């Protein structure tokens, strides 16, 4: 089985040997975020499941970016749990099926996941510099970024921030 670390109620229940209720839950996989697993399904899971892999939100962000970039698919976070879990398993030489489900995401959430995924992988980052208010200083920074094969996605420039206002 697999569930998010921030809502690992089944894992906690299996470890306790009984259904337990978590005090709180916190995960981006809201489709599977439950404090208490179902009492009717618990005995079946307890009897038939080898274990539960807990996936943190960072792993879900990475899985989202992988699926979007490599397969051009939008899969909601709960549906990505099985993809993220594959990195925890040794299945070399075996056939594996992973069910991808749900694409119910708004574009702001998609944008946020892409940005966090790129940041997590070191593909984008933010930096801040204070420059003298002279012509060419901004060009000097842009040239430095370009020489490193970088690209500037967003630039905030306030030439008045350094003025001495005594």
Name these PLM-found stretches.
Residues 87-115:
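Catalytic phosphate/nucleotide-handling subdomain of diverse soluble enzymes
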Residues 17-31:
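N-terminal glycine-rich dinucleotide-binding loop that anchors FAD/FMN and/or NAD(P) in oxidoreductases
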Residues 3-8, 28, 36, 58-60, ...:
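Glycine-rich beta-alpha junction loops
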Residues 11, 57-58, 74-78, 151-158:
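Flexible, glycine/charged-enriched surface loops at secondary-structure junctions
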Residues 15-21, 71-73, 116:
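Short, hinge-like loop/turn segments at secondary-structure boundaries
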Residues 107-166:
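A conserved regulatory-domain signal marking ACT and ACT-like small-molecule sensing domains
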Residues 38-94:
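Active-site-adjacent helical/loop segments in soluble small-molecule enzymes
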Residues 1-21:
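Glycine/threonine-rich beta-strand-loop-alpha-helix active-site module
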